[in-house]
């Protein structure tokens, strides 16, 4: 199936249809699906650049059907003087069957890898 935006079919509605088809497929095959989305530029105008669910670009339906939404924030991207170099925040912004929250992890950009911080770093 092809998802194409046309005069009758906007990009947002094509993404919405795609989101619902992914959900149906996951249920049918009894699998988990990871969907990666681009953020819109709304956060660029905010003082706090941490992403929010409302920042998901043209993909409100993806957020709607998702069981969990994890957003990634790296302070060093927006703040040259950041003391959090190599640290990322994984923001569990939506969790249908549990709590939401933030986990701080080590980020290795050269291989796009996340790792747990050492135990002593948890208390910072």
Q: What are the residue ranges of the model-derived segments?
A:
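Short acidic catalytic loops
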Residues: 1-4
């Amino acid at each position: 199936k092809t998802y194409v935006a046309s005069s009758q079919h906007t990009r947002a509605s094509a993404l919405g249809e795609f989101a619902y088809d992914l959900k149906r497929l996951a249920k049918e095959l009894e699998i988990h699906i990871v969907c990666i989305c681009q953020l819109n530029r709304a956060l660029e105008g905010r003082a706090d650049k941490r992403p929010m669910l409302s920042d998901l670009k043209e993909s409100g339906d993806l957020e709607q059907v998702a069981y969990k939404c994890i957003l990634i924030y790296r302070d060093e991207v927006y703040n040259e003087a950041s003391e959090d170099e190599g640290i990322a925040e994984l923001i569990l912004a939506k969790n249908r069957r549990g709590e939401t929250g933030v986990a701080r992890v080590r980020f290795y950009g050269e291989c796009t890898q996340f790792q747990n911080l050492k135990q002593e770093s948890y208390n910072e």
